[in-house]
Regions:
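Transmembrane-helix signature of polytopic, membrane-embedded enzymes
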Residues: 2-6, 84-107, 125-126, 145, ...
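Transmembrane-helix motifs of polytopic, lipid-linked glycan transferases
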Residues: 5, 9, 71-92, 130-134
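Membrane-interface alpha helices of multi-pass inner-membrane proteins
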Residues: 34-37, 101-103, 146-160, 172-174
Length: 196
């Protein structure tokens, strides 16, 4: 999709140009330290983010250690904006409007400020939007593969930032509610197998 590529490149380019080259405020110092030296973040610990960051900053391509963590957040944020475009198209928002909305979200002050520092929110948004997209795909197609992928990504999202994922759960349930009978029937098959 050319729109996705445009959103990805525009947001990532702007994030890279404005990304700090040093440690910033909030939790960035803590996350920089943990990503480079190991450890556990403040509660709830953010295990998915920490493990991803540790792997990313240890790639042998970075000259400045601080930039690696910030870059990872920028990549997650740009990917989130691209997935938002997919969600908008699933909701029948097409053309220039969907691209514009994804760009406006990616360039909003709050999102941008978190996208350019090493912080858990860009990954949380990315995972939530993937969950939203998978829920919409399941609603539209009733293919079980979307439900299975949703379960996996939802679990990963909980291990990244459970409070934010919990806040978004009612939206996912509202989308899936009309398909509740199919979902229960799907879940009963393994439950019956385990009962044996």
């Amino acid at each position: 999709m050319p729109g996705m590529l445009l959103v990805l490149l525009v947001t990532l380019s702007l994030y890279l140009v404005t990304m700090p080259q040093t440690i910033t405020l909030e939790d960035a110092g803590l996350f920089q330290m943990i990503c480079h030296k190991g450890g556990i973040g403040h509660p709830p610990g953010y295990p998915l983010f920490i493990l991803s960051c540790q792997a990313f900053v240890n790639l042998p391509v970075f000259e400045q250690d601080v930039v690696a963590g910030n870059l990872m957040s920028a990549l997650f944020a740009s990917a989130a904006c691209s997935v938002l475009l997919i969600v908008l198209r699933q909701l029948q928002v097409t053309g220039l409007l969907s691209v514009s909305l994804a760009l406006v979200y990616g360039l909003s002050a709050t999102f941008w400020s978190q996208a350019i520092i090493v912080e858990v929110y860009s990954l949380a948004v990315l995972l939530f939007l993937i969950c939203l997209s998978l829920s919409l795909a399941y609603r539209d197609s009733e293919q079980v593969k979307y439900l299975l992928w949703l379960a996996l990504v939802y679990g990963l999202a909980l291990s990244n930032h459970w409070p934010l994922q919990g806040l978004g759960t009612p939206a996912l349930l509202a989308i899936l509610a009309p398909k509740a009978r199919l979902i229960v029937r799907f879940l009963l098959v393994p439950a019956n197998f385990l009962a044996i």
